[in-house]
């Protein structure tokens, strides 16, 4: 790996982020190409069209697209791979980009201003995009195996998971909790746009503090399924992991299943050009946020000590990322 690879990869990563953000990938739909005439059919202003045309032009230079003489823009194998993995670019560039540029400027490692450098909505969106591409089928199949009625999503982000679950399971209702005000604002918009106001509600709170909210206790007691994707490591850095798990059990006393997914420390010691996507980015940002990332074996020990029975462990098709079904 050379410096040129890293530099060009950084520029390409930003390009990929904007291809998704500005809706260029969306123009392909489920196809591998689209006709450029579609840009005139869309309700874009001149500035938007110029931005999209420039993004397409640079995407051909980076080898993401092919601009053919017949007016079609086609995805290359690299472009298809970028689109499939776009969630990781939304997560890193959109969610943590500002943090990764500025974290060394923070004087106090306990200063909450570091969280102001993180775009929680983009972190949630990127996680959801990656979830849909790699993990969602496994999670839905697991939910279908269970008899679910009232589900709570800890760290719900923009409520994408809850919305999808309620679309699949007609009689299910959901509650989402997230500490990010941006993510909750996005969730409220998504819930409204999907006509789910009567089935899903969201709360802007720290999960551990929500457990003491008297206005939520009655709702918590109706929950039969708890889900949480890529957030346990945050909770485990607030309090002792076993205490956190026991608190969740007490908070949701009638929950029959806990579906908890997280990413663990990589076993690799050196990054190479063959290293898989995401893992090192995950470890990098959390290290400089002073958030410890654990090993899978440690989670198994925490669950056991908290009194959970591990019913199933499933790999989620993202490096070092697993789903635990607990009861």
Labelled PLM ranges:
Residues 158-170:
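Conserved SAM-binding loop of SAM-dependent methyltransferases across substrates and taxa
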Residues 147-157:
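Conserved class I S-adenosyl-L-methionine
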Residues 234-247:
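A short, conserved alpha-helix within the catalytic core of class I
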Residues 180:
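Conserved SAM/SAH-binding beta-strand->alpha-helix loop
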Residues 1-98:
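N-terminal accessory segments
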Residues 58-146:
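Conserved Class I S-adenosyl-L-methionine-dependent methyltransferase catalytic core
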């Amino acid at each position: 790996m050379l410096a040129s690879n890293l530099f060009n990869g950084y520029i390409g990563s930003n390009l990929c982020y904007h291809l998704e953000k500005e809706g260029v990938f969306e123009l392909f739909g489920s196809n591998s190409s689209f006709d450029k005439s579609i840009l005139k059919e869309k309700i874009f202003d001149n500035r938007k069209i110029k931005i999209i045309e420039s993004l397409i032009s640079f995407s051909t230079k980076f080898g993401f697209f092919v601009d053919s003489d017949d007016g079609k823009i086609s995805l290359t194998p690299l472009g298809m791979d970028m689109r499939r993995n776009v969630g990781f670019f939304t997560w890193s560039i959109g969610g943590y980009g500002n943090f990764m540029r500025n974290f060394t400027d923070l004087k106090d490692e306990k200063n909450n201003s570091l969280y102001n450098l993180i775009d929680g909505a983009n972190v949630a969106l990127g996680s959801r995009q990656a979830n849909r591409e790699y993990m969602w089928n496994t999670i839905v199949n697991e939910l279908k195996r269970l008899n679910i009625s009232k589900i709570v999503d800890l760290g719900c982000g923009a409520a994408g998971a809850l919305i999808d679950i309620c679309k699949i399971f007609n009689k299910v209702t959901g509650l989402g909790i997230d500490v990010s005000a941006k993510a909750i604002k996005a969730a409220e918009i998504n819930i409204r746009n999907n006509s789910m106001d009567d089935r899903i509600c969201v709360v802007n709170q720290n999960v551990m503090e929500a457990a003491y909210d008297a206005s939520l206790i009655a709702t918590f007691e109706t929950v039969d399924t708890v889900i949480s994707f890529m957030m346990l490591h945050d909770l485990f850095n607030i309090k002792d992991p076993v205490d956190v798990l026991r608190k969740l059990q007490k908070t949701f006393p009638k929950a029959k299943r806990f579906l908890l997914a997280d990413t663990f420390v990589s076993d690799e010691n050196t990054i190479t050009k063959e290293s898989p996507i995401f893992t090192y980015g995950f470890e990098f940002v959390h290290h400089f946020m002073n958030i410890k990332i654990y090993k899978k074996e440690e989670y198994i020990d925490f669950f056991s000590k908290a009194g959970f029975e591990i019913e199933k462990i499933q790999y989620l098709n993202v490096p070092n990322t697993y789903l635990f079904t607990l009861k």
